[in-house]
UniProtKB/Swiss-Prot annotation:
NCBIfam families: PRK00558.1-5 (NF001824), uvrC (TIGR00194)
Protein name, entry field: UvrABC system protein C
Family designation: Belongs to the UvrC family.
Lineage: Bacteria, Bacillati, Cyanobacteriota, Cyanophyceae, Acaryochloridales
Biological process per Gene Ontology, one example term: nucleotide-excision repair
Subunit description: Interacts with UvrB in an incision complex.
Protein location: Cytoplasm
Keywords: Cytoplasm, DNA damage, DNA excision, DNA repair, Excision nuclease, SOS response
Record domain UVR: where: 215-250
C-alpha cells in the first residue's frame, strides 16, 4: 500500500495526494500518516475515513499550529478498514499504545505528576514511585499520574508496612537476606525464599489499592481472615486483621457526599489558557476520593470537549477493564460521548455512562474538580512566566538575536586525570530536557591518572559534538532542533579559548553563541573579551545559567562515579580472552583468590570445570609472560 519513500510531501505533490485520497474508502477505520523516513507521525480513527483524511488537506492555515506542522511532513497515508466505529476506536487505542506517534502525544511529559510503577516484567516485581513512564516494557504497569505526591508516598509507605514486598532494586548481600526480611518487610526475594507465584499473589492485592478497589480488597481479606481462624491459624488471622485495619484508614478524611456510594465514578474537568490545558481527574470509589490524577495537555489541539475526549481515551485506553469506573462525570459535552461510552462498556463488560451533570451534587463535584484545575493552571502559568522572564533576561544580557530555545552546557569530571568523562546537558525553553543529555568518555591519551587537562578534554568533546557539521557542510545548522542557540562551558577564559580554537578548526564557531561560566566568582566570559561580563548574580538570566552549569556538574560527577566504580570492580581476569563471567566464578570457587590462580600450574587450572587445556594455558601465560 505504501509508495517508495519520497523527500517530497504529499502536500507538495498534488497529483499524488489526490491519487492517495481516492484510494481511501468512505468506511470506518484507522488511518496512519507517515513522514519521508516512513516513521508514523499520527494515528487516527474515523467513521468515514475518506472525509476525515481529506479534511487535513483543506484550508491548512485554519488548523491549529500543531496539526499544520504535521500536515506539512506527511509523505504517505495508510489505512485499516473496520466494521464499526467502536472497533476503530479500540484499534486506534492499541496502535497508539504500540507506536507512540509524535503527534498523538497530546499529554505533555510533565515531571511534577508522579506515577506508581509495578515492574511485572521482572520475576519478582518492584513497586515504586517514578516521574517518568518508560515505554520499553509492555508488561510493566503504571498508575497515575497523581497530583498529591505526599498522599501517594504515605499510601505506599502504609502498603509496604502492611504487606511484605521487595524493598531493594539490587540485593544487599549475595548469600543471605537483609534486615528487611528479618523484620517482616520483605519475603526474602533476593534468596528466593518465596516462590514468584506466591509473591505475585501478594502484589496483586496491593495493586487493588491503586486501582481504587480497596473496599473489594478488604472484603477479600476479611473472608481469608475468617477462614484462617476456622483453620486455627491464628497468626495468619492476626496478620490479616492488621492489614484490614490499616486499609480501613485509607481515604477516611476524603469523604465525598454522593447519592449512591456503591457506584464507582470518575469526575474530570480542565482549565486552559491559549497554550496549556491543566486536566484534573478525581477517582471516587465507595464515596471516597481515592485518587486525584493530573494531566497537562496541548490547549491548541481542539475545543475543551475535544481535549477531554482525548485525555479520557489516552487514560482509559491504558487501564485494565477492572479499573474502569461505571460512571464518568465530565465538565462539558464530548464530541463522541456515545462512541467512547460504548467502547468502555465493551471493555468493562458492564454499562459505563458518561454524563455532563448540570444540577445538584454531581454538578458541585465537577465545579470542585474544575476549581482544582484552575489552581494547577495558575501554578503552571507562574512557573512558565518565571522561566520566560529568565530567558528574556539572558537574551538581553548576552545580546542574543532571539530567546534561546536550546541551550547546551558542558563539564568535565575526573580525579587527577583518572576516569575522565564529560557531560552535555540540554535545556529546552529554560527547562531540563533529559532525553537530550549525553555522556562522553575522554579519549585523549594524555589525559590519564596523574595527569589532567580540562582544556584539551573540553576541546575534544566540543569537537566530537560538532564535527558532523564539518564533515557534511550541507547539513542545516541554525534553526534546526539539534543546533544550540547557546553553548555554555563550565570554566574560565582558558577553557573558553581552548573550545573556540577547536571549533574554529572545524569551521562551526561562526554559527555558535558560546560563553563560559567560571566557578569561583560565577563570572561569565564571552569570546574576544578579556574581562567578565558585568552581571548581578541574582538576576534571572544568570541564575538560569547557574542552574544549567550545576546540572551539567551533577551529571558529569554521576557518570564519573559510575566509571570509577566499574574500574574498581573490574577483575584482572577480565583481561584474559575467552574467560567469561561464568568461568571466572568457577576459577574463584576452586582457588579462592587471584593470587592462588596465579600460582597454579596449567594442569591444576584445567582441572576446573569448563576450563579446557587451551584456556588453562592462556591463563597461565597471562600471569607468567615470557
Amino acid at each position: 500500500m505504501t509508495d517508495a519513500v519520497s523527500t517530497t510531501t504529499l502536500l507538495k505533490d498534488r497529483d499524488r495526494l489526490e491519487a492517495r485520497l481516492k484510494e481511501i474508502p468512505p468506511e470506518p477505520g484507522v488511518y496512519f500518516m507517515r513522514d519521508a523516513n516512513d516513521d508514523i507521525l499520527y494515528i487516527g480513527k474515523s467513521k468515514k475515513l475518506r472525509n476525515r483524511v481529506r479534511s487535513y488537506f483543506r484550508q491548512i492555515q485554519d488548523h491549529p499550529p500543531r496539526i499544520e506542522l504535521m500536515v506539512h511532513q506527511v509523505a504517505d497515508i495508510e489505512f485499516i478498514v473496520t466494521d464499526t466505529e467502536a472497533e476503530a476506536l479500540a484499534l486506534e487505542a492499541n496502535l497508539i499504545k504500540q507506536h507512540q506517534p509524535h503527534f498523538n502525544v497530546l499529554l505533555k511529559d510533565d515531571k511534577k505528576y508522579p506515577y506508581l510503577c509495578v515492574t511485572w516484567s521482572q520475576t519478582y516485581p518492584r513497586i515504586f514511585i517514578t516521574r517518568k513512564r518508560r515505554l520499553g516494557k509492555a508488561q510493566d504497569k503504571y498508575y497515575g499520574p497523581y497530583v498529591d505526591v505526599w498522599q501517594l508516598r504515605q499510601t505506599l509507605r502504609l502498603v509496604k508496612r502492611l504487606f511484605p514486598l521487595r524493598q531493594r532494586r539490587k540485593p544487599l548481600f549475595k548469600d543471605r537476606p537483609c534486615l528487611n526480611y528479618e523484620i517482616g518487610r520483605c519475603p526474602g526475594v533476593c534468596q528466593a525464599l518465596i516462590t514468584p507465584e506466591a509473591y505475585r499473589q501478594i502484589l496483586q492485592k496491593v495493586v487493588m489499592i491503586f486501582q481504587g478497589r480497596t473496599s473489594e480488597l478488604i472484603n477479600t481479606l476479611s473472608l481469608q481472615m475468617e477462614q484462617a481462624a476456622e483453620d486455627l491459624n491464628f497468626e495468619q488471622a492476626a496478620r490479616l486483621r492488621d492489614q484490614i485495619k490499616g486499609l480501613q484508614g485509607l481515604g477516611v478524611d476524603q469523604k465525598v457526599a454522593l447519592p449512591d456510594d456503591t457506584v464507582s465514578r470518575d469526575a474530570i474537568a480542565l482549565a486552559a489558557d491559549d497554550q496549556i490545558a491543566c486536566v484534573q481527574l478525581f477517582q471516587i470509589r465507595s464515596g471516597r476520593l481515592v485518587g486525584r490524577l493530573g494531566f497537562m495537555a496541548d490547549a491548541q489541539s481542539g475545543s475543551l470537549g475535544m481535549i477531554l475526549q482525548h485525555v479520557l481515551e489516552a487514560h482509559y485506553g491504558s487501564a485494565e477493564p477492572v479499573e474502569l469506573p461505571l460512571e464518568i462525570l465530565v465538565q462539558t459535552e464530548l464530541p463522541e460521548t456515545e462512541l467512547l461510552a460504548s467502547y468502555l462498556s465493551q471493555r468493562k463488560e458492564r454499562k459505563v455512562s458518561i454524563t455532563c451533570p448540570q444540577r445538584q451534587i454531581k454538578a458541585e463535584l465537577i465545579e470542585m474538580v474544575e476549581r482544582n484545575a484552575q489552581y494547577e493552571l495558575a501554578r503552571t502559568q507562574k512557573s512558565r512566566d518565571r522561566t520566560l522572564n529568565a530567558l528574556q533576561d539572558l537574551a538581553e544580557l548576552l545580546d542574543l538575536p532571539e530567546l534561546p530555545h536550546r541551550i547546551e552546557c558542558y563539564d568535565i569530571s575526573h580525579i587527577q586525570g583518572s576516569d575522565a568523562v564529560a557531560s552535555q546537558v540540554v535545556f529546552i525553553d529554560g527547562l531540563p530536557a533529559k532525553q537530550h543529555y549525553r555522556r562522553y568518555k575522554i579519549r585523549n591519551p594524555n589525559v590519564k591518572a596523574g595527569h589532567s587537562d580540562d582544556f584539551a578534554s573540553l576541546a575534544e568533546v566540543l569537537h566530537r559534538r560538532f564535527r558532523q557539521y564539518h564533515l557534511s557542510p550541507e547539513q542545516p545548522r541554525q534553526g534546526t532542533s539539534d543546533w544550540p542557540d547557546l553553548v555554555v562551558i563550565d570554566g574560565g577564559k582558558g577553557q573558553l579559548s581552548a573550545v573556540l580554537e577547536s571549533l574554529t578548526k572545524i569551521e562551526v564557531v561562526e554559527d555558535l553563541q558560546i560563553i563560559s561560566l567560571a566557578k569561583q566568582r560565577e563570572e561569565i566570559f564571552q569570546p574576544g573579551e578579556s574581562q567578565p561580563l558585568p552581571t548581578d548574580p541574582e538576576q534571572p538570566g544568570v541564575q538560569l545559567i547557574r542552574r544549567l552549569r550545576d546540572e551539567a556538574h551533577r551529571f558529569a560527577i554521576s557518570f564519573h562515579r559510575k566509571k570509577r566504580l566499574e574500574r574498581m570492580r573490574r577483575s584482572r581476569l577480565d583481561d584474559i580472552p575467552g574467560l567469561g563471567h561464568h568461568r571466572q566464578k568457577e576459577l574463584l570457587a576452586a582457588f579462592r583468590s587471584i593470587d592462588y590462580i596465579r600460582e597454579a600450574s596449567p594442569e591444576q587450572l584445567k582441572a576446573v570445570p569448563t576450563i579446557g587445556p587451551q584456556l588453562a594455558q592462556k591463563i597461565y601465560d597471562y600471569f607468567h609472560p615470557a
